[in-house]
Swiss-Prot record:
Reaction it catalyzes: a purine D-ribonucleoside + phosphate = a purine nucleobase + alpha-D-ribose 1-phosphate; adenosine + phosphate = alpha-D-ribose 1-phosphate + adenine; cytidine + phosphate = cytosine + alpha-D-ribose 1-phosphate; guanosine + phosphate = alpha-D-ribose 1-phosphate + guanine
Gene3D superfamilies xrefs: Jelly Rolls (2.60.120.10)
GO molecular function: guanosine phosphorylase activity; purine-nucleoside phosphorylase activity; thymidine phosphorylase activity; uridine phosphorylase activity
InterPro entries with a match to the protein in the record: Ppnp (IPR009664), RmlC-like_jellyroll (IPR014710), RmlC_Cupin_sf (IPR011051)
KW Glycosyltransferase (keyword) present: yes
Organism: Sorangium cellulosum (strain So ce56)
Enzyme Commission number(s) from the entry: 2.4.2.1, 2.4.2.2
Pfam family membership, one: Ppnp
Enzyme superclass (EC): transferase
Protein name: Pyrimidine/purine nucleoside phosphorylase
Family of the protein in this entry: Belongs to the nucleoside phosphorylase PpnP family.
Length: 93
């Protein structure tokens, strides 16, 4: 079953689904800066555009262009900055 999610006044939208028993979402992040909290560990893969990421506890922003991934621990969070719309795949680990 597909589940639509909308965050930050519609600036981040995703569709959730299950694949091989694991939850995943695919989505689009519009231009802006947003903070996400995590319950479970996640792997984010940028599939279009580029995102700058800063994980909780860090002062450093790291750029992730299309085709690259990063992981975030559960019960934590991260900031995302997009200078143009970008697409992503989120896998819950």
């Amino acid at each position: 079953m597909l589940k639509h999610n909308s965050y930050f006044n519609g600036n981040v939208q995703s569709v959730g689904f299950e694949r091989h028993g694991r939850r995943q979402t695919v989505g689009v992040i519009d231009t802006g800066e947003f903070h996400f909290s995590t319950d479970a560990p996640e792997r984010m893969t940028v599939v279009a555009g580029e995102l700058a990421i800063r994980v909780d506890g860090s002062t450093e922003w790291r750029a992730y262009p299309a085709g690259t991934s990063f992981e975030v621990a559960g019960k934590s969070g991260f900031d995302v900055r997009a200078t143009q719309p970008a697409g992503y795949l989120c896998e819950f680990l």
